[in-house]
Amino acid sequence: VYTGTFDPVTNGHLDIIERASKMYDVLYVTIFINPHKTCLFTVEERMEMLREATKQFPNVVIDESSSLAVEYAREVGAQVLVRGLRATEDYNYESLMCFTNQYLDDGIETVFLMTRLAYTFVSSSFVKEIVSHKHSVEGLVPACVEEKLIEKYRG
């Protein structure tokens, strides 16, 4: 299970998805619905962008959940949570999440994948900021996502 807000999905996310999809028979890429977070895109829009961006990976299942990651993993019968890391800041946060998940369910493992160097600076927030200032994010997000971002920001 690979969870995230994916608002929007970036090429950094896709790097992790592609690599994790080679490691497991099925990879659930799950949009975590956080009622305390304001998103640019609706859940439906994010699902649509993820489906389009991952259509080349036949073993990737796109889903949504408001459950905790370990609860969702239990629901779908998964034993591994995949997390992507860009830098030490990600590690600090993700290690705390890993320990929390171990506390909640010691039978579900967390696997950390370092993103490729080209994507170490890429985040959904960063991408939205760039587009809001009318700059291109080509190479940072799939083309279908860039189109949706431009529609949102430039009307």
Task: Describe each region flagged by the PLM.
Residues V1-G155:
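Nucleotidyltransferase catalytic core that binds NTPs
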